[in-house]
């Protein structure tokens, strides 16, 4: 007995936690700073924490009411019908829902390179084939309609990330509209707005009002600080929103997740604090880090440091965990999550020391 051929599938390797790294290095986890996974520097919304505590005694019940309540809240927020909100177990769950709804075996998708690995992984799980469009470092990872269309060849799904991970680059609404107009009638353009709260540019949501070939992806993992409970959703055109009922898993978001999400949506103060601090950290990192950086609209900065693995390892030994971007095909770059003021300043100090030593 063996599984099907998985040789084309890659393994998603999430960043390691502070406790794991501390044990390996013999360090005190309380003395370490993790700025590697684009997590919220302030943790979860305090209101969400209270909602989780208050829901503990209801864990024997399936999340029917809370699921419906959260969908209604999100529908009001985005000015869509409840049917257009596809609630899921994290943003990756929303990607799976869209793949199940759209892909027949053997159909192609188009993904960015560098980019979020799970776009391709989800497509392959659903027996799709994967093609890539390239974001060029020489062009500062610019995201334009031409960036995508020059590599487009009739794929069923095209994935756009705005702001993009790991570069922080963005698509304009006009660029997304052009891509949707210039691709085939049966091509779905998925705009991943996981970092959408951190940008000053508006969401691409208005495109859904007059198009049936654009869908959005959103998550509670970043600005809301709820990565650990796995809660995300897609916003899809009304014309085919009813497909969710046919492809969704039973109770795709847990009772705890739904209750936390409802509370987090009302905690504007936590989101504003997170967004404002990230904006400060981006400016500080760009100004104070002794390495070239790219403008970013996310809660992170990409920097070119030479030997990314050496820099990341040396910083980690000094208690600062950042992301080596070799896995993105950028072995000369690191990604630094925006932290609190104290953590960001410490990270810059350590990284500048390490960069100087490695280059010496």
UniProtKB/Swiss-Prot annotation:
> Which top EC class applies here?
transferase
Q: Which Pfam families match?
A: Aminotran_1_2
Q: Which UniProt keywords apply?
A: Amino-acid biosynthesis, Aminotransferase, Histidine biosynthesis, Pyridoxal phosphate, Transferase
Q: PTM N6-(pyridoxal phosphate)lysine: list the residues.
A: 222
Gene3D superfamilies, alphabetized: Aspartate Aminotransferase, domain 1 (3.90.1150.10), Type I PLP-dependent aspartate aminotransferase-like (Major domain) (3.40.640.10)
Q: Does the keyword Oxidoreductase apply?
A: no
Q: What is its EC number?
A: 2.6.1.9
Q: Which domain of life is it from?
A: Archaea
Query: Which reaction does this enzyme catalyse, per its entry?
Result: L-histidinol phosphate + 2-oxoglutarate = 3-(imidazol-4-yl)-2-oxopropyl phosphate + L-glutamate
A Gene Ontology biological process noted in the UniProt record is: L-histidine biosynthetic process
Q: In which pathway does it act?
A: Amino-acid biosynthesis; L-histidine biosynthesis; L-histidine from 5-phospho-alpha-D-ribose 1-diphosphate: step 7/9
Q: Which cofactor does it need?
A: pyridoxal 5'-phosphate
Show the SUPFAM superfamilies listed in the entry: PLP-dependent transferases (SSF53383)
Gene Ontology molecular functions: histidinol-phosphate transaminase activity; pyridoxal phosphate binding
Q: Which PROSITE patterns match?
A: AA_TRANSFER_CLASS_2
Q: Which family does it belong to?
A: Belongs to the class-II pyridoxal-phosphate-dependent aminotransferase family. Histidinol-phosphate aminotransferase subfamily.
User: Under which name does UniProt file this protein?
Assistant: Histidinol-phosphate aminotransferase
């Amino acid at each position: 007995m063996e599984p099907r051929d998985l040789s084309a599938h890659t393994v998603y390797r999430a960043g390691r936690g502070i406790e794991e790294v501390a044990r390996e290095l013999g360090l005190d986890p309380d003395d370490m700073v993790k700025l590697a996974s684009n997590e919220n520097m302030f943790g979860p919304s305090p209101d969400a924490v209270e909602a989780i505590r208050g829901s503990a005694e209801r864990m024997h019940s399936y999340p029917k009411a809370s699921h419906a309540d959260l969908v209604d809240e999100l529908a009001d927020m985005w000015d869509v019908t409840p049917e257009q909100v596809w609630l899921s177990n994290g943003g990756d769950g929303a990607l799976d829902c869209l793949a199940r709804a759209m892909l027949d075996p053997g159909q192609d998708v188009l993904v960015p390179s560098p980019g979020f690995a799970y776009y391709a992984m989800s497509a392959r799980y659903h027996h799709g084939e994967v093609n890539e469009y390239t974001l060029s470092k020489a062009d500062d990872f610019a995201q334009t309609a031409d960036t995508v269309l020059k590599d487009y060849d009739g794929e069923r799904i095209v994935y756009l990330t705005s702001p993009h991970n790991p570069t922080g680059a963005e698509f304009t609404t006009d660029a997304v509209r052009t891509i949707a107009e210039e691709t085939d009638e049966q091509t779905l353009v998925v705009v991943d707005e996981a970092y959408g709260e951190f940008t000053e540019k508006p969401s691409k949501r208005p495109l859904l009002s007059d198009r049936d070939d654009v869908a959005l992806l959103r998550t509670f993992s970043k600005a809301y600080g709820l990565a650990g409970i796995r809660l995300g959703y897609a916003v899809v055109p009304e014309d085919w929103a009813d497909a969710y009922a046919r492809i969704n898993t039973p109770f795709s978001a847990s009772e705890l997740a739904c209750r936390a999400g409802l509370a987090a949506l009302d905690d504007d103060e936590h989101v504003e604090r997170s967004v404002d601090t990230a904006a400060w950290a981006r400016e500080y990192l760009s100004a104070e880090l002794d390495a070239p950086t790219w403008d970013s609209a996310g809660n992170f900065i990409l920097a070119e440091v030479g030997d990314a693995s050496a820099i990341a390892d040396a910083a980690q030994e000094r208690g600062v965990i950042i992301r080596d971007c070799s896995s993105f095909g950028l072995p000369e770059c690191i990604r630094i999550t925006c932290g609190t003021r104290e953590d960001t300043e410490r990270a810059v100090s350590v990284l500048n020391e390490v960069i100087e030593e490695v280059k010496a």
